[in-house]
Regions:
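N-terminal secretory signal peptides
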Residues: 1-11, 22-27
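Cleavable N-terminal signal peptides
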Residues: 22, 33-34, 39
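Kelch-like beta-propeller repeat domains
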Residues: 37-431
Length: 431
């Protein structure tokens, strides 16, 4: 096995200069304009310690997994999807994928947009996990159309595994149309990844039929995070409708600090408010550890690469600020194994410069402290280079042949739209 050592939490970036069509790779020190943007981005985080103040620990290895493939067996590049583990299977829901067949250029539109949202659901079955067809251990398969998400062309969905089902909230339809739907995926039988989606009836939580009151979000929301906590689902942050917003990406939306929860055992179903986050954020992730909900990084109108972390013990007060991450990031790979929460890569936008961060960092929930992480990357039989420098995919923790791993399926190597079908898998230190 060929390997190479990765430098922890460096800020080498692949950067697209908006409006110029040029690509810059490497440290952004070559021009005054880029250096000025670096200074502006750094000014926003002076309240936190410098990167060099964080200790470095060594451990963990990146490898490549099976590539994503669509229903026709083609490699399927995908980003901005939801990734959820249910009954040991990994589900990819929504996201941007290449239009098939590719759109042809015209005089009016010589460079047509090549991507669209999708309702196709892909499933990965870990090695050593007993499963019924169509599951194939160690491979991705496209589920039968009856198991696809009920709305086509979806992306930035918020989804969570909760009490034996997948709950999916909001998201964007088409280019960036707002949605407030709530859909639940129920497996058909034990050991099978196949199932059906349905809206949720308010009165008893069953499948909602035409003419019945179906559960929706209080307001459309996308790109937030959700966790399962006991009988509740907590939905946090994200973007909500707002005209003439200062958002640097989309002036029809703004980030929110809103936190709401749903107790799926209390009927009629009803969304309730929880304490708001200290900082609004979207394109972030969250985990549950030691009886607390932890939210990490993300972006908002102040910064597109937040360092901030917050945690809350439900029904025991509000959010507690935690130590800032060494490097701010949004849309980064994030997942927990044991007491450690790992964060890799991410996206940033500063002035007219966008890019991805090459960063490996780890948070210990027992000590409430961050470290930089020096990892190893295998280059054979498949090259795992770039695992710690992508965005648009949120890590999930899987168990394969009895070993806990972090999977990062798809995503993008550069900012905005640059999806890949590569799947990267991180083997944490200590197995």
């Amino acid at each position: 096995m060929k390997t190479q050592r990765q430098v922890p939490a460096t800020i080498t970036r692949k950067t697209f200069l908006v409006g110029t069509g040029s690509l810059v790779a490497g440290p952004l020190l070559a021009s005054r304009a880029l250096a000025a943007t670096e200074a502006q981005a750094g000014d926003r985080h002076r309240e936190g310690p410098p990167v060099s103040a964080y200790p470095i620990i060594t451990g963990g290895t990146w490898v490549r997994g099976a590539n994503l493939k669509d229903a026709q067996g083609r490699f399927q590049a995908r980003q901005e999807h939801a990734a959820v583990v249910l009954n040991g299977f990994v589900y990819l829901i929504g996201g941007f994928v290449p239009i098939q067949p590719p759109p042809q250029p015209t005089e009016n539109n010589p460079e047509p947009f090549a991507f669209e949202g999708t309702g196709e659901v892909l499933v990965y079955t870990p090695q050593g996990h007993p499963a019924l067809p169509p599951a194939v251990p160690g491979q991705w398969v496209s589920l039968p159309p009856r198991s696809w998400f009920p709305l086509p062309h979806m992306h930035h969905i918020v989804a969570v595994s909760h009490r034996g089902r997948i709950w999916a909230f909001g998201g964007h339809a088409g280019p960036f149309a707002r949605t407030d739907g709530v859909f639940v995926f129920t497996p058909e039988r034990a050991g099978s990844p196949v199932g059906t989606w349905s809206p949720v009836r308010v009165t008893d939580g069953g499948p909602c039929r035409p003419g019945e009151q179906c559960l929706t979000l209080p307001t459309p929301r996308a790109a937030g995070a959700a966790v399962s906590f006991g009988s509740r689902i907590y939905l946090m942050g994200g973007v909500v409708p707002h005209e003439n917003s200062p958002d640097p990406v989309n002036q029809s939306i703004r980030t929110t600090d809103s936190v709401i929860y749903l107790d799926t055992t209390v009927f009629p179903l009803r969304w309730r408010r929880a304490p708001s986050l200290h900082a609004s954020r979207e394109h972030f992730n969250a985990v549950v550890r030691r009886g607390r909900i932890w939210v990490f990084q993300g972006r908002n109108e102040v910064s597109t690469h937040l360092r901030g972390v917050e945690s809350m013990r439900p029904d025991r007060g509000g959010w507690r600020k935690e130590q800032d991450a060494p490097v701010g990031a949004s849309a980064n790979i994030l997942a927990a194994v044991g007491r450690r929460v790992y964060s890799f890569g991410g996206e940033f936008i500063a002035s007219n410069i966008t890019g991805t961060l090459q960063a490996s960092q780890v948070f210990d929930v027992s000590t409430r402290s961050w470290s930089r992480l020096a990892t190893t990357v295998t280059t054979a039989p498949l090259d795992a280079t770039g695992a710690d420098a992508k965005h648009g995919t949120y890590g999930v923790t899987i168990v394969e042949d009895g070993v806990r791993k972090i999977m990062a399926p798809g995503g993008a190597a550069t900012a905005w739209f640059d999806p890949m079908s590569k799947v990267h898998i991180f083997l944490p230190p200590g197995g």
